Amino acid sequence: MRTNLYKIFLLASALAWTCLGVASADENPSQLDCATTVFSQPDVKFMHKIRATNAQATLSVSGLPKGLTWNATRRVVEGVPQKSGRYTYQIHVTEHGKTTSEKVTFDVSDQLQHPIPFMGWLSWNAVESEVSESIVKHVADLFTEKNLTNYGWNAVMMDDWWHAKSRAADGRPLPDPQRFPNGLTPVSDYVHGKGMRFGIYTDAAEYTCAGAFGSFGKEQIDADAYARWKVDIVKCDYCNAPSERDTAFIRYRAMADALEKAGYGTMLYICEWGEREPWKWGAEAGGRCWRISQDVRDCWTGAGNGEGLLQSIRDMKNISAYQGVNRFNDADMLCTGLHGTGKSSSMLCGGKGPGMTQDEYRSQFALWCMWSSPMALSFDPRKELQADDEAILKSGEVIALNQDAMGQQADLISEADSLVIFAKDCENGDVALSVTNISEKAKTAVFDFSKVSGLDVQKTYVVRDLWAEQQLSDAKGTLSAEVRSHATRVFRLAEKKNGVKAVSPLSVPGFSVAASKGKLVVAMPGTEKLSKRILVTDLSGHVKKIMTTTGVNVKMKLPAGNYYVDVACNAQVVRTKVVM
């Protein structure tokens, strides 16, 4: 009887998929090559890139909600939505004299599950079957002791093999009794007590990739358990499952519905390795981020199913129009700190050697930030974190790109001469530029502003080197940079206003962000006439206060809690964690 009921559920899910307007792969092919389910927080700048499968097609948009406009030159819907709610608008594609229209669903809410990509640690690369209560607690301790949480690293996630050999007699999922002798509730409570989020792993099949029990057919009983354990993120793999895209959608939708019914607010992280193009349907299936490739390995060039950094660039470079707030393309785990000591991360890269070079680790990190990919560290927490690696993890101005409230993935600008150039729009109006030298020798890169739609060749820009955290000379029309082999340079550009200082005042003594008598106090001496963008968020990225000001002292009332305060001015962003 249960089997028949489950089949009925699957059929109903398939019908719901059709009603959502997500056509199966073989019927009603879309004329669009971009997201049609998009999200924003109220009062935060929004951007939706509109792209057609035929790049020469004419595009237009109608029915936009208040606060949004259509920028035909850049082919983006942009603006600031003011009120929460569900809205729709139409995209019209005209080619060869024929026009087709497609609906966009636009959800505006201050309670989105994943407004900015998560930053944390995932157990698989270094730990695999050894994941345990002690290791999870050790990671939480390490992140707080080294002040990594101040930079945004605030999630500890268990991958495969946390499971007992079998479920309880009543079907409930159980953790391994030796490695988690007290169950998972105390583990979750410990992580939460450190001001961090707790994540777990499952599979949309009967068995996980490592052979533990999966969630297929038991979605609700598992979701209820995750709610009891206060799990914030569930990574859901797709091993041992049918290959069809329609089936994947149905199975992930079943898990998303179960998580919603369980009531804790657990976020679904889809992991089917990009084989069924989840960026085209993951949001409709209830996912908030999705892997776009096979597992990343600790090497520059991968082999077989192993992704090196070159393969990550290949897989991410053409899907930026499918990303935005609450819907992120995930480039997989970061290898910073591994140095060839990982387990699966060293496979398919020859199984030998020291891993990547420090320039290559920095390149991987910079690109993940330009792409606003979720960032899951994967080093062994039981080993000493090298100073160079810790410096990467505390590169606050680079991280600010990843955590930008508009959630945009950088667009590919050029791959000429083995120099891979990306450009990224930021919420405060700045534009970030990166160049990765994939050749074997040093090169000079030239950014041509006429190729970057967010820049104006007639305007002058304040330029900041984000790795060096230094202001450079102003730029107009072009920007040149020397780039070592396999290195990545990252710059942030802000339009220069007449009479405004070029040097960022956030670098000088006197700047401070602190809690005082129940108020947040931001002191910015020497910034008269300079425009500052201030965003106050909780640790998950929900915007609690937002303002643009030319004032030098700002006070805000906030309830008790942990917050990140991001202050942007003259191409520099400073993040401060405060406890009220």
What does each model-identified segment do?
Residues 76-84:
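Extracellular/luminal low-complexity segments enriched in Ser/Thr/Pro
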